[in-house]
């Protein structure tokens, strides 16, 4: 299938077969598609609506073009990468949760990037925390094995994305690539907590993860956040060994007080780093509570807890024992020594 044929198919509202979607993605990743063709295709695809099968096919090709990291560890690799794009301007909740989950014994391979729609992306706050995000991919497996956590900076692992970056920026609207980042973890995480920017995406994205062979996942949308929230209800679509279930969780279920959105606001990287350090040092409040819920989810899908409630208890122990803060310190030391 050529790019022109793919655009014509999608403009007519017809879905692409997985092989067709893969062919299109290969052309974009290999630099064979022109900027006009990429823009036309992405816009038409968004207007049609992406199917789980199409998204999974795109993700498989993106994974094939990835610079991989293959740590030798026992246990499940877990990612806490979300789609972003919720516009809520919170502090970096899933980044803080990654350290807490790691402190509870989860091996975390967090995939992320610099800010796109917020003032501070995961890469930005980690830099402010002292982590060297530019560590060579060839050294990252060793860091995971040593510390139990690594940050996988997307541009270092997805060089083929350079062929579509300018067009994405020119379009200025969400495309399927906003969904693909969390689906292309360079370490091949088998379990994920994946936050999405729209409640309608929880089911389809869980289907995509299942098609991609992910064994355990929670796809979440929390009252406007791409996180499990303490400000209201969170819609969860859970994947467990090909079985998909839908349910709602609330902060009150786990003994937390419902918070106002303003309680979770972040700012620039330095401010967000201060918030995260305070949480890891044991400061109480809504920021701690939301991190506990999200870290608890990572602990749960990673197989260290039988329920989300048990995962949250392990998360609290991780912070209160100092292990979560210890993981941050270990990652800072390891990355600075590896660069």
UniProtKB/Swiss-Prot annotation:
Cofactor: Mg(2+)
Residues the entry annotates as binding anthranilate 2: 168
One GO term describing the cellular component: cytosol
Keyword tags: Amino-acid biosynthesis, Aromatic amino acid biosynthesis, Glycosyltransferase, Magnesium, Metal-binding, Transferase, Tryptophan biosynthesis
Protein name according to UniProt: Anthranilate phosphoribosyltransferase
Domain of life of the organism encoding this protein: Archaea
GN (gene name): trpD
Gene3D superfamilies: Nucleoside phosphorylase/phosphoribosyltransferase catalytic domain (3.40.1030.10), Transferase, Pyrimidine Nucleoside Phosphorylase, Chain C (1.20.970.10)
Residues annotated for 5-phospho-alpha-D-ribose 1-diphosphate binding in this entry: 82, 85-86, 90, 92-95, 110-118, 122
Catalytic activity: N-(5-phospho-beta-D-ribosyl)anthranilate + diphosphate = 5-phospho-alpha-D-ribose 1-diphosphate + anthranilate
Positions annotated to bind Mg(2+) 1: 94, 227
Record EC number: 2.4.2.18
InterPro entries: Anthranilate_Pribosyl_Tfrase, Glycosyl_Trfase_fam3, Glycosyl_Trfase_fam3_N_dom, Glycosyl_Trfase_fam3_N_dom_sf, Nuc_phospho_transferase
Pathway noted in the entry: Amino-acid biosynthesis; L-tryptophan biosynthesis; L-tryptophan from chorismate: step 2/5
GO MF, one annotated term: magnesium ion binding
Binding site for Mg(2+) 2: 226-227
Assembly description: Homodimer.
Annotated GO biological process: L-tryptophan biosynthetic process
Annotated residues for binding of anthranilate 1: 82, 113
